[in-house]
C-alpha cells in the first residue's frame, strides 16, 4: 500500500489516536486543531515530539479555508473530521468532499440519525453512539 497524506481535523482522543496509528503505519499525517495546546496529546504518543516523528500540526479552525489550506487539504488522500461538534464535522467533511475533491472523507457523527442521512449523501460516517447502542444491546440481550 502506498503512503497516503491524511489530514485530521481535531486532536482529541479519536483524532490523535488515529493520527498516531497512521503515522506509525508509514503515512504522512497532518492534524489541525483550534487549541494550540492540543498537540500535547499528539506528543504523548510519540517517543519524540509529534513533528520530530514526522507529523505536522496546524493551529486553526477547520471551518476556515485558510487553515485547511495551511494544513494541506489540497493534497489530502484522506480527510477525517473528528472535532467535538457534529455540525462542524459535517460541514468540514462536505467542504473536503465537494470543494477539494478528497478521495476518502470520514466523519465522526454522534447522532445516529444524522450519521445515517449523511452516509446516504456519500460521506463515510462513524457514529460512536450507534456503536455503543449496538454493543450494549448485544451484551444485554445475549444469553
Q: What label would you give each PLM region?
A:
Residues 1-143:
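Cytosolic regulatory regions of ion transport systems
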